[in-house]
Amino acid sequence: MRTYISGSRRLSNIFWALTITLGGLGFFLNGCSSYFNTNLLIFSDASSIAFIPQGIILMFYGTVALILGLFLCLTIIWDVGFGYNDYNADQITVYRKGFPGKNRELNLTFPSEVVKSIKVRVTEGLNPRRQLFLCLKDSREIPLTGVDQPAALNKIENEAVTLAKYLNVFLETE
């Protein structure tokens, strides 16, 4: 039994990456327009803005936004967070993709005998969370759900019950 976890390639992440990048480009070009006393933007005239202090601040904010937008775009391209959970009778594998480097891929494999239970953690409030954890006998808790929008409560409960029955372990709630 295999379940896939969505990574950072979501519509909301793409929206924010484009919004921050385009906004940062506008701020940066606005600051450059005030420095060169020429209009680099089609939709506004920024050449009349004083370079010190307004233009320099616009360039700073634009640079920060462009760097943040680049980070978000690279996160989407690399699909950070994507992975799967693979459950077999003899072993359980948790695989996730991360940022490039030495530890780009996280691949955890556990024998089924070390699994103590499946835990459901539901947190309501301003930042609601509904998570599944694989609890091991040595008190480690391995998260099995992604970080996208919280799933419906009955969906998480059904997934937890199905998984606990399949692995023949207890089901805990918190």
From Swiss-Prot:
Protein name as it appears in the record: Photosystem I assembly protein Ycf4
Top-level taxon: Eukaryota
Family: Belongs to the Ycf4 family.
Record membrane topology: Multi-pass membrane protein
Compartment list: Plastid, Chloroplast thylakoid membrane
InterPro entries membership: PSI_Ycf4_assembly
Source species of the chain: Emiliania huxleyi (Coccolithophore)
Keyword tags: Chloroplast, Membrane, Photosynthesis, Plastid, Thylakoid, Transmembrane, Transmembrane helix
GO biological process: photosynthesis
Predominant location category: plastid
Function of the protein: Seems to be required for the assembly of the photosystem I complex.
Gene Ontology CC entries for this record: chloroplast thylakoid membrane; photosystem I
Keyword Transmembrane: yes
Segments traversing the membrane: 11-31, 56-76
